[in-house]
Amino acid sequence: MSQQHTLPVTLPAALSQKLLDTVPPPVNTQQEQRKQPAPLPPPCQKVPVELPVEVLSKHEEKHMTIVKGVPEQECEQQQPQEQELQQQHWEQDKEHQKAENPEQQLKQEKVQREKQQLQGQLEEEKKLLDQQLDQELAKRDEQLGTKKEQLLEFPEQQEGQLKHLEQEEGHLELPEQQEGQLKNLEHQEKPLELPEQQEGQLKHLEQQEKPLELPEQQEGQLKHLEQQEGQSELPEQQRGQPKYLEQEEGQLKHLEEQKGQLKHLEHEEGQLELPEQVGQPKHLEQLEKQLEHPEQQEGQLKHLEEEEGQVKHLGEQEEQLKHLEQQEEQLKHLEQQEGQLEHLEQQEGQLKHLEQHEGQLELPEQQVGQSKHLEQEEKQLEHPEQQEGQLKHLGKQKAQLELTEQVGQPKHLEQQEKQLEHPQQQEEQLKPQEQQEGQLKDLEQQERQLEQPVFASAPGQVQDIQQALPPKGEVLLPVEQQQQKQEVQGQHE
């Protein structure tokens, strides 16, 4: 017996593919494989077959063959192609499911439409909100702009006043220079003394310069602002400024007149000068130049101090503006309260009118109650002996009725107020009043008949007094009023 040697045999790729194709696929994928034939796998690629893990592993071990001459890089390039094929396969499955389930497709379409509608609504709401925000911002910007303009108006007015004051100071510098020159001339020209009129004018100029100093002006402005705060009106501030400007203009005119007088005096002095004083003008010019520098420095220092005072003054004015705004808000609140008071006064007038109307309605109702009570008592007066006592009793009851009606008025008034709300009920109430007036006239006639002489009964005769019941269609008085009547009767007895 010759020994048989078994050698491992490697099958080619075509045979391994045939063996794999013989395996039946699952039930769900049979139709798809019939419609679309599976493409041939490239070399070095595992065939995707849905088989148990054990079977696949066995077949892979037996039938995996390596193709010679194919590098590994080509296999790596073939992997993305496999992914694309799988995606196409999934898309085909989805289309097939959509064709089988049209209801789900319709539901999905509805959901998408609803999402689109909601997105459109959200966008519209966002647009509206943006517009509202823009409008509110624009309004706030306008309000801030108006407030800034109002605040800026005051500094502008103050700047104008400062310029005006600077001009006045420039005009005042000339008289000061002239004073220095005059003093120098007095020292150099002892025989040429100035007349007494010039000295009086110089003193007058010094007195005028003192009230024009800025600190005193600021005090006057502060007093003026305090008066304006009491009035709390901006237009009145502007009215006070023209008066102040008129005063300044008057002072400037007066200064100009004084300048003219000084020029006239200088001209006279020039005529009185001796020929030896020809060299004096140059000396005077040098002195004037020397005097200008310290005066300029002093003017600058004063100007700086004035600016600092003005800055403080602006801060005070801003606080005043805030205070004025608060006062305006308080005024608006007071106006609202006044409107509410007027409304309350109108309501009080209406209540008074209702009370008057109720007072007019009380009389016929009292008469109705009295007439019913008198009718009951007249029916009881069947016997002549009882008439005298009952007449007295009637008088007492009338007095009691007046008291009880006053006590029961609050409840009665409330009922009347409810009745007054309906005009139809008022008309119905007026009809029985007319009937009551006729009944009262009949009662007065019956009372006159009762006042006639009464015959006394026999001594042994006994009379039975019964309480008369009200006739049909009439109602007795309330229990509370009857009790009050009995109490009043006991007090009178």
Curated annotation (Swiss-Prot):
Q: State whether keyword Repeat applies.
A: yes
Composition bias type Basic and acidic residues, residue spans: 90-116, 139-151, 161-174, 184-193, 201-213, 250-270, 282-360, 372-386, 411-431, 439-450
**Tree of life domain:** Eukaryota
Q: Which InterPro entries does the UniProt entry name for this protein?
A: Involucrin_CS, Involucrin_N, Involucrin_rpt
Q: How is it modified after translation?
A: Substrate of transglutaminase. Specific glutamines or lysines are cross-linked to keratins, desmoplakin and to inter involucrin molecules.
Q: Where is this region: Disordered?
A: 1-47, 60-123, 139-493
Spell out the Polar residues composition-biased ranges: 228-240
Query: Where is this protein found?
Result: Cytoplasm
> Which residue ranges have biased composition labelled Low complexity?
76-89, 473-493
Q: Which Pfam families match?
A: Involucrin (PF00904), Involucrin_N (PF10583)
CC annotations in GO: cornified envelope; cytoplasm
* Swiss-Prot/TrEMBL GO biological process terms: keratinization; keratinocyte differentiation; peptide cross-linking; response to UV-B
What is the documented function of this protein?
Answer: Part of the insoluble cornified cell envelope (CE) of stratified squamous epithelia.
Which proteins does it associate with, and in what oligomeric form?
Directly or indirectly cross-linked to cornifelin (CNFN).
Q: What protein family is recorded?
A: Belongs to the involucrin family.
- Protein's UniProt name: Involucrin
Question: Lineage from the top down?
Answer: Eukaryota, Metazoa, Chordata, Craniata, Vertebrata
The coding gene here is IVL
